[in-house]
Structures are given as C-alpha cells and as structure tokens.
Amino acid sequence: MADKSYDAVIIGGGHHGLVIGSYLARNGLSVGVFERRYEVGGGACTEELPFPGWVRDVHATFIRFFISPAYYDFKLWEKGLKLIFPPGATNSCLWRDGTAMAMKPLNDVKEKTMHWPYLPENLEENVKQVASFSKKDADTCYELANKYRDVWKEYVEKWHYNPPPPLGEKDLDEILIERKLVKPEWVTMDVGSVAYDVFESPQLREYYMRLAQGHIGIYPNQPQHLMLTLHTLGSMLGGLPISIAAGGTHNVAHALQRALSEQGGDFYVLSEVDKILLKNGRAVGIKLADGTEIEAKKMVVCDTHVNQVVGKFIGEANTPPEIVKKVKNLHAEVGGWWVHFALHELPKYKHEATHPGCLTQRQYNMPLEPDWFRYQQMEEANKGLLTKYIYFHLTHYSAFDPRWAPEGKHCSLVEVYGPKISQVGYDWYRKVDKELVSRIVEQWQWYAPNMTWDNVIGYHSDSVEAMGERLIDMVGNWTMIDMTNDQMGQRRPIPEYSRYRTHIDNVYICSSVMHPGGALHGLCGYNCYKRIAEDWGLEKMWEKEGRPF
C-alpha cells in the first residue's frame, strides 16, 4: 500500500514542474511535487556568494519570465515576484575598437498584461546607432525589425507557445518556407553563415553570433532552428526588454511555489525519486530513494533530463530499444563558466563617453574578431584550449537592484563558453579555472580600464561541473541538450517524445529538454500542460482568457 496518494505526481521541482503542477492543481487534481535538492526551483536558483552580503544567480540570470502565461494566470506579482526593468537601454554591445550600441527595447512591458505597446521611436534611435558604422546594416536591421513585427512574430510566438504538431503534419518552419516568407537557405545554414549572409559589418556579424549564443547556447558553426533564427534577427535592434528578479531569480521559484500551494498542491524537498512504478504498461506511482512509495492515480510528469526518465525512472528494460538508442545519441556540445565578481565599484566603460547608459542589464563586450569567433571558437574548445578571446555576456546586478551587494559595493556576472565535459573532463575545468578568471580580468580592461584586480574583492566561478552536479545533467549544458536544428521542434528531444508524452501513455516530460528548449520562461511546463489538457479534458484557460496562445 502506498504511503501517500496523488492524482498527479511530479518528479523534480524545477520551474517547469512548478508551472505544470500549479495548472494541474488549478483543475482540482491533487498534486505532489518531489524534489531531490534542498529547495525547489531548479535553475531558478540564487545563493549567497562569493561572500555573505552578496547574492548571485547560479543558473538562470537573463530572464524574460513576463512572457510566461503562468506569470499572468497566477498573478505572480502578488506572490512576491518583482521584475525589474532597467530604464533606458536594456541591451548593449561594446567593441574593443571603441564602437558601441546601447539599444532601447521595442516594447513597453506592463506588469499585469501581455499587451505591450510598441515603441517605434526606440527603433529609429537604435537604427541610427547601427548606421554609424554601416548604413547598409542599419537599413537591413530596420527591415528585419519590421518584418519580424508584421510577419514573423505571429509564427514565432505560435511555435513557442504550443506543442509541436504531430509527426507527419507540417511544422511552422515548413509553412513559412512554403508561403515564401523567409529565405529557405536559412534552414540549413549555421549561425555564422546567417550572420555573414545578412550583415556586412564586422560589428553586426559578431553581435548576431553572440546574441544567438546567448539565446540558445550553441557555437557559431552550429545550425539553429529557423524559428530561432527569425527570433534572433528580430531581436537585433532591441526586441523585448531583459528583466532581473528583485533579490534573485530564486524568487521566481518562491512565487510559483506559492501559486502551487494556494491551488492545494504539495511539494517535498530532499525527496529523490528512485523509479517510476509500472503496472500493465502504465505508471501507478513512484518509489523514493528511501523506499517510500507514492501512488499516482492519473499521471506522472518528469521535470528532469530525458536520460533520467529512460535510463532510471522508467528503465531501459521497459523502453523500446530504438528509443533507448536515440536518447543515448543526444548531444550536448557546449560547456562554459559563469563567474560572479564582487567589486568595489562598477566597471567604468570608456564607451560611455559616446554612449551614455551603455552599462546595461544585458551586455556584450566583444573583441571585433568575427572570423575567429565563427571558425575558431569551437575548434579551439574541442582541442581543450582555453578560449583566446573572452566574448563577454554579462550583467551588472547591483547597478539596478541594491539587494545584490552590500551598501557601496557592487557585483557583475560574466558568462563565457568553453568545451564540452565529454571532450575534456571535469579535471580540465578545475585546472584552468584560475587562468580563465585572470583572462577575463585582463580582457575586461580593454573596455573598462578600472577593472583591475584592485577593484575585485573576490569571485565565485561556477562551471559546467557545478551545473551538472546541481541539476544532474549529461555534461552541464544549460539547455540540457543542444538547441541545434536537429534537436528542436518535432525532433526535441526525439521525435517519439516531442509532444511531451513518453511511450508510457501517462508519463510526461516537461523539462527544458523538451520544446521550446532552455531558458527561464516556463513554456516547456506550459506546453506540456496543453498536451495533458488535450489528453485529459482539462481547462483551456488561454481560450477562456481570449489569448491566442
């Protein structure tokens, strides 16, 4: 006899699991969420590092959780989640030669609605900045921004906010090509090839490649899905603003947990799941590592890696060999570091003389070496070489929220990509960590001369090793598996599982290994709920609310 019983059991308390748990509980189902770690949230994790008084996000940082329907359906702003939108420019690019762009958002995001006024005056201002180093690229960006707003946006949003169509039906990328709304060759191009096809200036080529890498975590010589190509092109001149969660991204998890609890759901931490209990080809519950058994009267939902679902929870013996093979062949190529610096003062960027306000929430500092970035970054990583150039993807938390550092002090986070763990091993990351941080500080001074070691109080380096251990990942990839074209849409993670249901018809997967992939947006959980609503006849709140998605 089971120790506890729920209609729906959720394995893993990451933000996707909390999203889907809240929706299921809203439908009157009894819901239990079981989390291995000491707190729920998964990648929505904030810790006091590197010293008492400083906090840092150890996973998700650059967030747009306001795009998540769960943010509105559960009124998370009433549950402790405050999103901060820095004034002025939300996104900036600083190059070693002194050129820069500080781009304002193209939409005015409002807290309590998904209808955000368009800001054409910001587009005009952003275009002028591009024109300072390429009139042709400025015209191209203007055309792309308008094409995205008028045509592509509807398709991109529909793709993100819905499960992929069943196999055999056309996906939206195919429909776009059929209707001659995009260049068909973009489908097979890698990121670098698109950059060189669309733009002429080294600045815009480099920016596009780094923006794509920041969005989905792949190298310039890897191909991304067409819908993500369109999203990246449409974001070049500002797009939606970037936000930070006041006090840390873990407050997203706190708000979702409150939503779950208010709907009547339960959650348990330090409750590692050993396996899914099966009977007559269906899931009937789970067994915890301590031997406790939990009944699942209707379904089990996994907010975990597909490797765990197949290799551990369901078990290879209970899985068709072809599915086992496909899951084992999934690839996750990109590794990296996320280094949090405690600082005496904020970086003083020399570009501020010509671009006031270029210190932004999301910022790219780049050496203006697009050919190296396109061809050599991944090649050097695969050889186990420490990256020659630091392509800074950084934020300056304390400039916009004083909760992140003691009074009068500051902090910044730097993201840098590196080789995959399967190529070099954890020992390599440990060995080169200090050298990597020294290279960051050295090259930071190309852009901000005050960023010497005298300005650094201390740092905390979080690499793929820590991420892999924290979230039980194959190689510490923040998107779980690569978001390359072969592992997206109807192919993510494998065709048989692409609509969130496994070969066990009441076992579902809702983690970032599913469509639309990694990021703190809650859409994997939301779309998994859509599939479950279809299977079980549950509430379709998007229809009741009059939302398109």
Language model: regions and residue ranges:
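Extreme N-terminal leader/targeting segments of oxidoreductases
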Residues: 1-8, 26-27, 488-489, 540-549
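N-terminal glycine-rich phosphate/pyrophosphate-binding loop and immediately adjacent elements
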Residues: 2-157
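Helix-rich C-terminal "cap"/substrate-channel and partner-interaction subdomain
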Residues: 138-170, 394-490
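Active-site/ligand-binding neighborhood in enzyme catalytic cores
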Residues: 149-263, 270, 471-487
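A glycine-rich dinucleotide-binding beta-alpha-beta segment and adjacent secondary-structure elements
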Residues: 201, 205-218, 386-395, 449-515
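Mid-domain catalytic core of redox enzymes
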Residues: 245, 274-405
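Beta-rich nucleic-acid/ligand-interaction surfaces
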Residues: 266-267, 271-284, 458-473
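A conserved FAD-binding loop/helix module that cradles the flavin
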Residues: 510-533
